[in-house]
Curated annotation (Swiss-Prot):
Keywords: Amino-acid biosynthesis, Aromatic amino acid biosynthesis, Lyase, Schiff base. Pathway: Metabolic intermediate biosynthesis; chorismate biosynthesis; chorismate from D-erythrose 4-phosphate and phosphoenolpyruvate: step 3/7. Its EC number is 4.2.1.10. CDD domains: DHQase_I. Homodimer. The keyword Lyase applies. It catalyses: 3-dehydroquinate = 3-dehydroshikimate + H2O. Involved in the third step of the chorismate pathway, which leads to the biosynthesis of aromatic amino acids. Catalyzes the cis-dehydration of 3-dehydroquinate (DHQ) and introduces the first double bond of the aromatic ring to yield 3-dehydroshikimate. Gene3D superfamilies: Aldolase class I. The active site is at 143 (proton donor/acceptor), 170 (schiff-base intermediate with substrate). This is 3-dehydroquinate dehydratase.
Length: 252
């Protein structure tokens, strides 16, 4: 399986990489939180742009991105607008969503974008090609905050992301039972062993799914999300505890 290298970070080799999400509402908070995050041990900074209030002002959005880039120049920056239908803070049109991601790509400030699988096949394919033409990697994602589908459906979604040339397919699902967590882990393992030719990220959410956030190296998930202050999804562990646990599992 090929790895994905962003800056000096090799995703898909060694222990799972730690992603933290910054969810500031304005430029002042972006700056203050970025300074606080700089003192934290993580691998990838995700900027959750759906939390940013001045979203209609592209210049303001890119000014905030510039602050993040200048504050943590060595960290890969993942630009993410999480749609309301997949658990995000704001609802915008598909056209606005694509335009926002294209603006981020054009800015030269971001290393990766998050692109939701169910945005629309044509729009997804075109945006992936556009990102790659500008040397920006694509994390293609799907989130279900209500349920966990069967393993076959999980694998089908991950394979579809791969067929759309995502650099890193990602899926996050809500378990209704412990069996759902096992379904997610089994699907991850099958995808990793039989179909994946690139790193994937999977997780089962909430307290029930915490084990999935730690066991990526065993089952085949290349990264996991940790909380610096407020968790961006249910079940996230503090970033400091997460690094300790991942290191223990990696060295065992």
């Amino acid at each position: 399986m090929k790895t994905v290298t962003v800056k000096d970070l090799v995703i898909g080799a060694g222990a799972p990489k730690i992603i933290v999400s910054l969810m500031a509402k304005d430029i002042a908070r972006v700056k203050s939180e970025a300074l606080a995050y700089r003192e934290t041990d993580f691998d990838i900074l995700e900027w959750r742009v759906d939390h940013f209030a001045d979203l209609s002002n592209v210049e303001s959005v890119m000014a905030a991105a510039k602050i993040l880039r200048e504050t943590m120049p060595e960290k890969p920056l993942l630009f993410t607008f999480r749609s309301a239908k997949e658990g995000g803070e704001q609802a915008i049109s598909t056209e606005a969503y694509i335009a926002l991601n294209r603006a981020a790509i054009d800015s030269g400030l971001v290393d990766m974008i998050d692109l939701e699988l169910f945005t629309g096949d044509d729009q997804v394919k075109e945006t992936v090609a556009y990102a790659h033409a500008h040397d920006v990697k694509v994390v293609m994602s799907n989130h279900d905050f209500h349920k966990t589908p069967e393993a076959e459906e999980i694998i089908a979604r991950l394979r579809k992301m791969q067929s759309f040339d995502a650099d890193i397919p990602k899926i996050a699902l809500m378990p209704q039972s412990t069996s759902d967590v096992l379904t997610l882990l089994a699907a991850t393992l099958e995808m990793q062993e039989q179909y994946a030719d690139r790193p994937i990220i999977t997780m089962s959410m909430a307290k029930t799914g915490v084990i999935s956030r730690l066991a990526g190296e065993v089952f085949g998930s290349a990264a996991t999300f940790g909380a610096v202050k407020k968790a961006s999804a249910p079940g996230q562990i503090s970033v400091n505890d997460l690094r300790i646990l991942l290191t223990i599992l990696h060295q065992a």
